[in-house]
């Protein structure tokens, strides 16, 4: 692709399952590169593998991109100059160019049965330049026999004819020049027996016809790239620029598999992060730094700031470990930047899912108290249930440290005072506590700490007066009496 050509990149997932977190990073890097260079970001659905097609997967992909704000310029829904954008709707293109490869002597028909292929795999390993002459294909059969078999409806595939003992050079924007020995490359199937193209053929045909300038994808596709380069050469096309992103590794160092992720509590699928209460901006911020370095110490970037700073030459080639604690740290900053109203709105579904009925005003009060103490929105509920229900137990270390022989009497006296107040707000509960402390000639802490334990079951949390006011008069008094009964 000429260096002065307009930048056009594509995110081309297969709808064989929900969108993986690694797929979102690929989409993000494509998006950032396109926006940085005033180019086009294309969504293309690569659904040629009908056997693995999963209903709903395409909807999940679109929903994940919409949730994270990665808006594409062209795609199956909005169309574009290069429509259609589902490969299952573009089959005529693939058959046309597969035939051209055959006519050019760069691909061939193969009629081998599954049994013959299995025998080949067991004896020789690969269908390639050293073994294809032993098989039933258009290289070993006469033209008449090939035509006859096709006319009779025999099953066949079309395979790429990989040259023997050559070196294929792949120029990668991240890794530099990568060389591949063709003796280690198999004769890839390009068209399957059901007539559907494989990823490899459909991929290069669509990238060419859609004028894709840069192919930015995961490292797992690097080993396939020499096959693609051979096809570009055979068809007389200039290949796009390639950039293969580093693997996302588990915290233990290996490739982040679904099993490892589940064991480590790392969500695998993008929409699971929404369910877990992560902010989409935080997730993108975290993923951007999972392979790319901005060249500064700064770690928090809005999407437009990432666009301004992003470049492929600052993307590393080595795998990067997924650090869930780091993601939570990033998310914490985004949660703290929310307005209290926005946090309450985001928390509302989690509150209701937990079965709590809370007014808007009270929920906003609670959110204001806990906002700087949580990392993800659901923790408004999960880490602070004492706002919504009486504690079932009392923190042992807190009781040992904060509850003494005077605590019960002081707490009951405080409960009596609270019983008589009309306005149950922060100022009132503080005034009553400090007046009682003066009356009893004790420090305020002698009442504050038992009150916190009684009302929340903990020795830590938001300011005690805000806590009491948010829990409410009736609940506070009830909890204080229950604590005295339980702790003596």
UniProtKB/Swiss-Prot annotation:
- Asked whether the UniProt record includes ATP-binding among its keywords, one would answer yes
Q: Where is the signal peptide?
A: none
- Record the organism: Salinibacter ruber (strain DSM 13855 / M31)
Q: Which domain of life is it from?
A: Bacteria
Q: Specify whether Ion transport is a keyword of the entry.
A: no
Kindly give the InterPro entries that the UniProt entry links to this protein: aa-tRNA-synth_I_cd-bd, aa-tRNA-synth_I_codon-bd_sub2, aa-tRNA-synth_I_CS, aa_tRNA-synth_I_cd-bd_sf, Glu-tRNA-ligase_bac/mito, Glu-tRNA-synth_I_codon-bd_sub1, Glu/Gln-tRNA-synth, Glu/Gln-tRNA-synth_Ib_cat-dom
Q: Which UniProt keywords apply?
A: Aminoacyl-tRNA synthetase, ATP-binding, Cytoplasm, Ligase, Nucleotide-binding, Protein biosynthesis
Instruction: Give the protein name, as stated in the record.
Output: Glutamate--tRNA ligase
Residue ranges of the motif 'HIGH' region: 13-23
């Amino acid at each position: 692709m000429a260096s002065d050509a307009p930048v056009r990149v594509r995110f081309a997932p297969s709808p064989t399952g929900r969108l993986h977190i690694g797929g979102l990073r690929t989409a993000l890097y494509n998006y950032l590169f396109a926006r940085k260079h005033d180019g086009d970001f294309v969504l293309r659905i690569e659904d040629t593998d009908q056997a693995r097609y999963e209903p709903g997967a395409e909807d999940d992909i679109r929903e994940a991109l919409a949730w994270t704000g990665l808006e594409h310029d062209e795609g199956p829904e909005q169309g574009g100059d290069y429509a259609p954008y589902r490969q299952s709707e573009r089959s005529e293109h693939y058959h046309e160019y597969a035939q051209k490869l055959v006519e050019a002597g760069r691909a061939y028909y193969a009629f081998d049965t599954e049994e013959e292929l299995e025998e080949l795999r067991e004896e020789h390993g690969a269908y390639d330049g050293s073994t294809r002459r032993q098989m039933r294909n258009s290289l070993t059969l006469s033209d008449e026999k090939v035509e006859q078999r096709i006319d009779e409806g025999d099953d066949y595939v079309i395979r790429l004819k990989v040259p023997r003992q050559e070196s294929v050079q792949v120029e990668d924007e991240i890794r530099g020049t990568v060389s591949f020995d063709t003796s280690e490359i198999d004769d890839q199937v390009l068209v399957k027996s059901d007539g559907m193209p494989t990823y490899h053929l459909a991929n290069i045909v669509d990238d060419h016809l859609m004028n894709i300038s840069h192919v930015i994808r995961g490292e797992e596709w690097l080993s396939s790239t020499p096959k693609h380069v051979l096809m570009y050469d055979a068809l007389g096309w200039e290949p796009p620029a390639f950039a293969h992103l580093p693997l996302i590794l588990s915290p233990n160092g290996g490739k982040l598999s679904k099993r490892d992720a589940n064991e480590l509590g790392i969500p695998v699928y993008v929409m699971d992060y929404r369910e877990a209460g992560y902010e989409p901006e935080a997730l993108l911020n975290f993923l951007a730094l999972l392979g790319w370095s901005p060249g500064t110490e700064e770690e928090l970037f809005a999407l437009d700031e990432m666009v301004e700073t992003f470049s492929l030459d600052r993307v590393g080639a080595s795998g990067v470990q997924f650090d869930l604690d780091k993601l939570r740290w990033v998310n914490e900053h985004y949660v703290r930047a929310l307005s209290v109203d926005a946090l309450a709105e985001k928390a509302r579904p989690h509150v209701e899912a937990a079965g709590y009925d809370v007014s808007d005003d009270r929920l906003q009060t609670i959110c204001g108290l806990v906002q700087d103490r949580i990392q993800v929105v659901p923790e408004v509920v999960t880490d602070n249930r004492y706002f919504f229900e009486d504690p079932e137990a009392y923190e042992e270390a807190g009781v040992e440290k904060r509850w003494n022989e005077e605590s019960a009497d002081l707490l009951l006296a405080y409960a009596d005072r609270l019983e008589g107040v009309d306005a149950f707000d922060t100022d009132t509960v503080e005034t009553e506590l400090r007046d009682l402390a003066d009356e009893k000639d004790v420090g305020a802490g002698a009442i504050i700490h038992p009150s916190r334990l009684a009302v929340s079951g903990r020795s830590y949390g938001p300011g005690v007066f805000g806590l009491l006011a948010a829990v409410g008069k009736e609940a506070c008094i009830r909890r204080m009496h229950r604590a005295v009964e339980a702790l003596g």
